[in-house]
Amino acid sequence: MPVTDFNWKALIIVGLVAGLAQVATGVVMYLAGIYFASWSMLVSLFVLLLSIVIGTRWYTGRYQEGEISYSQAFVVGIVISVSTGIVYAIYNIISISFFYPHFWDELLRISTERARANQQTPEAIASIRETVTANKIAVGNLIRLSIAGSLLSAFTSLTLKTKRARG
């Protein structure tokens, strides 16, 4: 299927909805006090996986007449992942800047505790405050969701394809 044969508007909308699901998950984890838990990234990855699977199935049924090849499912998953990452990055910048006044204090406290536990030097611990910014957090999450989502898409595409891949 040529790149022009995708319904890009529908794919972007699916990605935006997936991004909002990721934001809702982040908000719930933050309010529950588990956002900084070492395992919270697994929750985010699980939400991303669900978004890819549900989004690909919906797109297949609605725009592909129930049939999708491996390469098509892979592209759909990547679009969902990158769109999710963009929405979540924007959320990070806005929420850290305006809505979560204690985010930096919590992040610095936890980062410092982890650095001490890993026996990092006092200089490295002191540099945490200078190097962590909302933009770096946002870009890091965009990259993480895009790369992890692409890998998840590669695997889920194997099970979501409904016809022989042509390309």
Model-derived features with residue positions:
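Transmembrane alpha-helical insertion/packing segments
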Residues: M1-W58
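Alpha-helical transmembrane segments of multipass membrane proteins
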Residues: A21-M29, V47-I52, T84-Y88, N92, ...
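Functional transmembrane-helix hotspots
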Residues: I90-A117
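Transmembrane alpha-helical segments in integral membrane proteins
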Residues: K136-A165
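Short membrane-interface loop/juxtamembrane segments of multi-pass integral membrane proteins
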Residues: T112-A134
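Membrane-helix interface/capping segments
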Residues: R57-A73
